[in-house]
Design a protein with these regions (language model features):
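ATP/NTP phosphate-donor binding region
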Residues: 2-106, 328
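C-terminal charged capping/lid subdomain of soluble metabolic enzymes
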Residues: 2-15, 309-394
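Active-site segments that bind and position negatively charged phosphate/pyrophosphate groups
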Residues: 209-321, 329
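Fold-independent oxyanion-binding glycine-rich loops
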Residues: 33-34, 56-57, 110-112, 133-136, ...
């Protein structure tokens, strides 16, 4: 079993070639209605004979049951591992130890973002490949070679990197459209940050992606396409999912949330939006009430405010239309609660990714950016209303 941390920067970001460009992606991406029923067939591509299936208790009685049936039909043996809800070191080590004796040649992670990240961690420890079957389009975790681990209380703990991206990602849009609209919208919030952060890394001569190298043209193009798809199809896709209906808009947005954003953030790079979003997890009540993409949305607005970007108003209006938070009140915070805001700023300031911005970032600048975005969001709520947000948040 492998417990040694992996650092891609030690491989790719050597001082002698510090201007190298590196592109990462999953080996295979499969999306469409009903594809989950063919996962046994897809596993034949990697000659899998013995699989560890990670799912929640609910998942094993729902989507994962189709996975198990497909594995049985393909003659693939499997062991079940029940995920308890938090991608923590304790949860990962427990499942890695329990699955060790069965010697799986692949881990299948069937579920949401934290389960997906746990599956990647488990596969790394067991020295086997990982296949991802997301049941939500709420974040861009499925395609990357990265996992975010949290404490048992849900506070961000650390980021783990892996030598390989998933062997395949299987996205069944029949499953996605039967989940809550709020999950798709949160995924849009996560994915919208991709272009704005990648753009910063591309424009900054010392900006880098998540393996410490310069972004490729492909990563930048994919990131930009991601934002274009969201602006054009996001509102209609959310409306379709609200009625559990698949459509071309849904297919496009699911691909943007999952594949385009997944490649874009890892190969294109991060800037302020994600470090700020991850800092919101320092406030316990936010962990319990809000999804990752909803916090990323607020981080994106703050980053655009910091840049004095002409896109700030466009993105704020889009977030209002789709139902994402645009001010601190919609994230159960208040601009006058300086202690909480300072805690978030202090955590974000420790993250080296914020220095991908093309100018020096100070605590005071982060504070001013948060407040600028909050004030614009508040004024836009007064002007355009918050019907979509209230519908999603009851």
């Amino acid at each position: 079993m492998t417990n040694k941390p992996f650092s891609p920067r030690n491989i790719f970001a050597q001082p002698s070639v510090n201007s190298s460009r590196v592109f990462l992606s999953p080996q295979r991406y499969i999306q469409g209605p009903g594809v989950i029923k063919n996962c046994g067939l897809y596993l034949s591509l990697i000659n899998a004979k013995n699989v560890g299936v990670l799912a929640s208790k609910r998942g094993f009685s729902a989507e994962a049951s189709n996975v198990l049936q497909s594995l049985s039909e393909a003659g693939i043996e499997y062991s079940k591992a029940e995920f308890m809800g938090e991608c923590s070191r304790e949860e990962v080590e427990k499942h890695a130890n329990n699955l060790l004796n069965s010697k799986p040649d692949c881990i299948l992670a069937v579920g949401g973002g934290k389960l997906v990240d746990a599956g990647k961690c488990i596969a790394h420890r067991l020295n086997c490949q990982v296949g991802i079957i997301p049941t939500l389009a709420s974040n861009d975790a499925p395609c990357s070679s990265i996992s975010v681990l949290y404490t048992v209380d849900g506070v961000k703990d650390l980021v783990e990197y892996f030598p390989q991206n998933p062997a395949f990602v299987i996205v069944d849009t029949e499953v996605i459209v039967n989940a809550s609209e709020r999950y798709l919208v949160a995924g849009i919030g996560d994915a919208m940050a991709t272009w704005y952060e990648a753009r910063v890394c591309e424009d900054n001569p010392v900006g880098s992606n998540l393996v410490g190298c310069r972004p490729t043209l492909a990563a930048s193009a994919i990131s930009e396409k991601c934002a274009q798809i969201l602006f054009e199809y996001g509102v209609s896709a959310a409306e379709n999912v609200r009625h559990n209906k698949n459509s071309e808009s849904v297919e496009k947005v699911v691909e943007a949330n999952t594949l385009l954003s997944g490649i874009g953030f890892e190969s294109g790079g991060l800037a302020l939006a994600h470090p700020l979003a991850n800092s919101y997890t320092e406030i316990t009540r936010l962990n319990k009430k809000y999804l990752h993409g909803e916090m990323v949305a607020m981080g994106t607005l703050a980053q655009l405010a910091m840049e004095n970007s002409e896109d700030l108003e466009k993105v704020t209006k889009f977030f209002i239309d789709i139902g994402l938070p645009v001010n601190l009140e919609q994230l159960s915070m208040h601009p006058l609660k300086q202690f909480e805001i300072n805690k978030i700023i202090d955590t974000a300031f420790k993250n080296p990714l914020i220095h991908h911005m093309k100018f020096e970032v100070s605590r005071d600048l982060i504070l001013k950016s948060i407040k600028k975005a909050d004030e614009l969001g508040t004024s836009y709520v007064c002007k355009y209303g918050d019907e979509a947000y209230r519908r999603l948040h009851g």
